Amino acid sequence: MNNMKQQPGPLDSEERDGCFSFGALNTTWKTLDGDGRSVYLPQHIRSYYIPFPLELPEELQIRRNQIQQEQEQNRAQGLPYFWNGEIYALDRFVIEREASNEDMTLDLWFRPSDYYTFLATNMSLKEPALREKHLSDVDWFQTIPYFSNSFGVSLAVITSDGYTVFTQRGRNVGARPQVFDTSVVEGLSRPVDRGTNGDAPDVYRCACRGMAEELGLHESVDFSVADIIFLGFGVDTRYALRGLTGMVKIKRSIEKLLQRWDNGVKDKFENQKLFAVPFTPEEVVSFAYSHQPFAPGPTLYNALVHEFGRSRVEDAFDSVAMPRI
């Protein structure tokens, strides 16, 4: 009689894509640094500025010019349009560790860009032919020439009474319309996010601006800059969008926050609805599973792990069932 235990079979031969999953929800996000437990100290996120834009190849420049013409026509006809805001392109980055304590460090080099270039490049990657030509063999630990025209911050806001806020993005925004998202998602903007010591952007200034414009939360009244914690860095491979994920605990209750949004905030059009959810792994996972499409998995995962530990978050993934469609 053979008493040997049956050996496990080989894993599926299909190669894993290496992307983050929020429990049962697969995503196109690749985590490049951070696990939710470690934090970036403010002095360890360093930004630099190269004051010269990259010149687009002819095919991309033609695409950008077409977008500009379309948006100008829409404006003239009284139709929804996108204005050409000044933004930053990420030229390159370096992930390292601080020598004495091995704290996470991130160095970022930026160039000037604009929103129409972003639409013509990153947001056009949904077209298979363009994607195949420029992203057929990509190393996500390197920036992609001409397709790095955005850098953002994504924050889970935690209220004084233990809630977090989810949003449903507006119908007429340029990226991910009507998707369910985290509390604050903001892209670096020139020159308003410029640091105090030069033209390089300050990611904390961007985070503060996003909280003010999208939720009506203001520094020194509702939170301090020291309350903003960045926990991870990565890239959404669908559109080659890179950014930082983090969390912030505010001094305002959920009822006061929702009331302020109802009464009016600067960029209310960016979100069509807010949702208040108790900030626990079980409640957050349940909301994510029942509201699709759901974008902010990496942001919420890092925030939950930082607050409750990885084991409880993974237990919530196992215990909360996906709704039947």
Where are the regions that the model predicts?
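N-terminal leader/linker segments that precede catalytic domains of diphosphate-processing enzymes
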Residues: 1-209, 217-325
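Juxtacatalytic substrate-recognition/specificity segment
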Residues: 212
